[in-house]
């Protein structure tokens, strides 16, 4: 889950008839009264200990006989040879119906120990449209009033226009616009003035640092200029154009990008996200994927459109996990076999279940899920358990709502990852700086060496590890790079490390694909964690460290700054490298 206000990550509503339409209505009228839309539900057998689940066909027959219910489709859970061996078999039913009918059937399902029925809710990347700590937004006008246009021109420090930057103003409501080819964005304010704004936030699409300007001096009678700095201008980024780039988080964890023996070759990693731009030089080696948001008449995912990443989120995660370093980021496992499963925009619980089924059927080793929901789904939970039984480690972002860990990260079958920031890795006039705690809280949300738990990260006992998640620079579509925040960025760091373990640790070689295999990989990754000096509900066991090309040395109690990493070795991982 990323905090990326430059991209609105709304997903499609689960497929239902148009508003007001009933099954069998036929052609839609050109004009129709707006009514409450029907809802789609996932209905299936519940896997309860000691109980035989209700047969899928029995469920289907009952639904077909219920007035007002439309069968929308099915979710095939596993290939026959998988569930014949003792796993979860059969299929779930997707059905839409009026809200009152859905509530009635849900009450009946809740009383059953062999059946579940839950709404097919859209998943989220949790990209915040309103940053934290902008203060109380002033009330918007009660009715439409005169429009006050305010022009903001965004240029780089070299004078070039910054195209497709998102300019957001917070004050009397919320106003947003994107820059055009000349770097110009027009913010249209409805009534009021522009001298009482709380903040102006400029988020470039790629290659520049963002700007966060509190109490901005905007005027409607002139052009307002905002100048952005290239990413490479900030020394803490350690970025040199045209050279392989290793981010601050990777360096902090011990990845230097120079050890040819640690590439992830032989492991399979899946990225369940928004797709991947394989035209990006750092991602051009990724060849396998499916678009679960684009289905043919036979319900088969499109095998090509996964390369069209309109949200950029999946490409950013892919860079951290498996970037090849070609004019861009060098990720943890550039030679791993990457499977891209596109869920966004449009992903709901049904798509996530289908993606997890794919991972079981294709013997994936590690899965990255930088997504979540504030609602739960039994079907997803059961398929997460099936993935664990198939030997798969599923890494899930904790969430960015600054509250309890979200679903499915809260499941015992997930490796839940929160976000970690470090002072000095971003300029002070960016919103990255605003994510740090307002007050130093040693032992709670702030640790040594400038480490901190960002305000947005979800917290709770379910958090197992933390991962770098503030100002993480990685690949975005079009060949550029961008700095993003979020537990969505923390999770790929842990996914990348787990992929290296799956590829190179001798204990994994030849192991049967079962729950023990997944637990061994996950537990080993957790064993690499070093305390970061903060409360466990924010960071879990800490940040995993490894250095594969240094002499053994005692590990510190607190994660070091990146410059200190040459003197740190995780003894456990060092044992792997000697085999």
What kind of feature is each model-predicted range?
Residues 2-7, 69-152, 170-174, 178-244:
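Autoinhibitory propeptides
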Residues 36, 53-58, 148-150, 155-172:
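Short, ordered, surface-exposed loop/turn motifs in non-cytosolic proteins
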Residues 2-133, 258-264, 268-278:
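Long, contiguous interaction/targeting segments characteristic
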Residues 319, 346-369:
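Substrate-binding/charge-relay-adjacent region of secreted/lumenal peptidase catalytic domains
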Residues 164, 318-321, 339-344, 392, ...:
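Hydrolase catalytic cores
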Residues 159-178, 182, 190-194, 203-332, ...:
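Active-site core segment of subtilase-fold serine proteases
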Residues 281, 409-503:
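Extracellular S/T/G-rich loop segment that most often corresponds to the catalytic His/Ser-adjacent loop
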Residues 360, 364-369, 382, 390, ...:
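C-terminal subdomain of the subtilisin-like protease fold in secreted/lumenal serine endopeptidases
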């Amino acid at each position: 889950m990323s905090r990326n206000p430059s991209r609105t990550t709304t997903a499609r509503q689960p497929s239902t008839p148009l508003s007001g339409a009933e099954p069998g209505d036929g052609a839609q009228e050109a004009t129709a009264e707006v009514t409450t839309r029907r809802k789609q539900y996932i209905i299936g057998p519940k896997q309860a200990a000691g109980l035989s689940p209700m047969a899928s066909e029995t469920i289907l027959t009952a639904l077909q006989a219920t007035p007002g219910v439309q069968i929308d489709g099915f979710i095939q859970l596993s290939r026959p040879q998988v569930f014949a061996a003792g796993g979860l078999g059969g299929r779930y039913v997707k059905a839409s119906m009026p809200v009152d009918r859905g509530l009635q059937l849900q009450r009946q399902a809740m009383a059953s120990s062999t059946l579940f029925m839950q709404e097919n809710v859209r998943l989220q990347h949790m990209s915040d449209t309103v940053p934290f700590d902008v203060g109380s937004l002033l009330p918007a006008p009660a009715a439409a009033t005169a429009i006050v246009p305010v022009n903001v021109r965004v240029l780089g420090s070299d004078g070039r226009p910054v195209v497709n930057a998102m300019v957001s103003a917070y004050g009397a409501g919320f106003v947003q616009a994107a820059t055009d080819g000349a770097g110009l964005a027009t913010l249209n304010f409805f009534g009021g003035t522009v001298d009482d704004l709380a903040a102006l936030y400029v988020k470039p699409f790629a290659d520049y640092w963002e700007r966060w300007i509190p109490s901005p001096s905007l005027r409607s009678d002139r052009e307002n200029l905002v100048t952005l700095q290239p990413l490479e201008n900030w020394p803490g980024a350690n970025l040199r154009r045209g050279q392989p780039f290793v981010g601050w988080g990777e360096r902090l964890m011990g990845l230097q990008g120079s050890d040819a023996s640690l590439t992830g070759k032989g492991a399979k990693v899946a990225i369940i996200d928004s797709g991947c731009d394989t035209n990006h030089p750092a991602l051009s080696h990724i060849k396998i994927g499916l678009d679960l948001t684009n289905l043919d008449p036979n319900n088969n995912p499109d095998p090509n459109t996964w390369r069209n990443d309109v949200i950029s989120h999946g490409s950013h995660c892919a860079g951290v996990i498996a970037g090849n370093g070609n004019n861009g980021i060098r990720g943890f496992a550039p030679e791993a076999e990457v499977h891209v499963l596109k869920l966004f925009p449009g992903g709901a619980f049904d798509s996530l279940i289908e993606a997890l089924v794919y991972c079981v059927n294709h013997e994936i080793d590690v899965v990255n899920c930088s997504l979540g929901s504030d609602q739960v789904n039994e079907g997803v939970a059961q398929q997460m358990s099936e993935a664990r039984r198939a030997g798969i480690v599923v890494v899930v972002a904790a969430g960015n709502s600054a509250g309890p860990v979200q679903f499915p990260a809260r499941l015992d079958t997930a490796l839940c990852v929160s976000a970690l920031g470090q002072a000095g890795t971003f300029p002070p006039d960016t919103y990255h700086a605003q994510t740090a705690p307002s007050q130093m809280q040693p032992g709670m949300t702030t640790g040594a060496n400038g480490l901190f738990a960002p305000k947005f990260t979800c917290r709770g006992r379910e958090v197992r590890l933390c991962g770098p998640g503030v100002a993480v620079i990685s690949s975005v579509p079009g060949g550029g790079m961008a700095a993003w925040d979020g537990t969505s960025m923390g999770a790929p760091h842990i996914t990348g490390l787990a992929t290296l373990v799956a590829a190179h640790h001798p204990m994994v070689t030849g192991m049967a694909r079962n729950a023990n295999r997944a637990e061994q990989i996950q537990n080993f990754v957790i064993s690499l964690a070093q305390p970061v000096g903060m409360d466990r509900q924010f960071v879990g066991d800490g940040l995993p460290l490894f250095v594969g090309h240094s002499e053994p040395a005692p590990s510190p109690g607190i994660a070091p700054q990146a410059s200190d990493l040459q003197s740190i070795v995780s003894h456990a991982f060092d044992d792997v490298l000697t085999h």
